[in-house]
């Protein structure tokens, strides 16, 4: 069986590399299944404290492999909603709910669902040559993989509409200027920069980082009153963590903390 997802765990970081470079790492059903299995390990293994996603070759991910759908213009219409429900919706939900930081290192073109997957990372770093393309409209489709929810939140309504309706390429530099991604780096430094950041996060109080992630995600739809209540509840949980005790102890003793993510 082909390895469409390359998995490597080191120093608390799981690096998952989308590995269909000849197809710009576009998804087929087997690639979806392999990614889902890898995510099970991230969810269950407490020693994995940060997830890094990237792509092999010159692309991050070109979205759905249309060759895998075998659309017959003269045959019955395919049920694309079933594909979304079976593969993309569970993927988006799992990454959003994962109580660990998710870094996306965008090494090249990210198109369609690949673009929304990339932009959905907690921290997104892109190579200078990377491009984001909301290619759905070119095929008569709507952005999925969380695209219609994500785009207005990372780009604002006007830019979200333009990106989704026109399907034009967006450069990494422009995405950074618009505040859609965290950082742009030279192509040759992307892998090292992303790994250094992932390893740093893996040494931090990741129990608290998970709460931060969930709180910020919840703020997108919560009222102020609801969010204040959530902050109270999450701060209570954080204050009971071993990492909080270690952080205070290290601060008072003027030493480097040794966080465990618990």
From Swiss-Prot:
Disruption phenotype: Mutants accumulate ring-1,2-dihydroxy-1,2-dihydrophenylacetyl lactone and are unable to use phenylacetate as a carbon source.
Enzyme class, UniProt record, top EC level: isomerase
A Pfam match: ECH_1
UniProt KW Transferase keyword: no
A GO molecular function held by the record: lyase activity
GO cellular component annotations of the record: catalytic complex
Reaction it catalyzes: 2-(1,2-epoxy-1,2-dihydrophenyl)acetyl-CoA = 2-oxepin-2(3H)-ylideneacetyl-CoA
Pathway field: Aromatic compound metabolism; phenylacetate degradation
Family: Belongs to the enoyl-CoA hydratase/isomerase family.
Protein name: 1,2-epoxyphenylacetyl-CoA isomerase
Natural source organism: Escherichia coli (strain K12)
Species classification: Bacteria, Pseudomonadati, Pseudomonadota, Gammaproteobacteria, Enterobacterales
């Amino acid at each position: 069986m082909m390895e469409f997802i390359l998995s490597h765990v080191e120093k608390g970081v799981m690096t998952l590399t989308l590995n269909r470079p000849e197809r710009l790492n576009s998804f087929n059903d087997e690639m979806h299944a392999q990614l889902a299995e890898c995510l099970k390990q991230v969810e269950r293994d407490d020693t994995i404290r940060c997830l890094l996603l990237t792509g092999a070759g010159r692309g991050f991910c070109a979205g759905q492999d249309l060759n895998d759908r075998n659309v017959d213009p003269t045959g019955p219409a395919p049920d694309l909603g079933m594909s979304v429900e079976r593969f993309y919706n569970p993927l988006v939900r799992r990454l959003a709910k994962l109580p660990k930081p998710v870094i996306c290192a965008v090494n090249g073109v990210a198109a369609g669902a690949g673009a929304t997957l990339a932009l959905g990372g907690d921290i997104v770093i892109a190579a200078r040559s990377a491009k984001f393309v909301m290619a759905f409209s070119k095929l008569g489709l709507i952005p999925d993989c969380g695209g219609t929810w994500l785009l207005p939140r990372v780009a604002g309504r006007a830019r979200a509409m333009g990106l989704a309706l026109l399907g034009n390429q967006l450069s990494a530099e422009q995405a950074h200027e618009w505040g859609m991604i965290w950082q742009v780096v030279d192509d040759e430094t992307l892998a090292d920069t992303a790994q250094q950041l992932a390893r740093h996060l893996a040494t931090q109080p990741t129990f608290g980082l998970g709460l931060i992630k969930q709180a910020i995600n919840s703020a997108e739809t919560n009222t102020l009153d609801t969010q204040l209540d959530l902050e109270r509840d999450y701060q209570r949980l954080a204050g009971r963590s071993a990492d909080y005790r270690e952080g205070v102890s290290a601060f008072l003793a003027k030493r480097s903390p040794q966080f465990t993510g618990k």
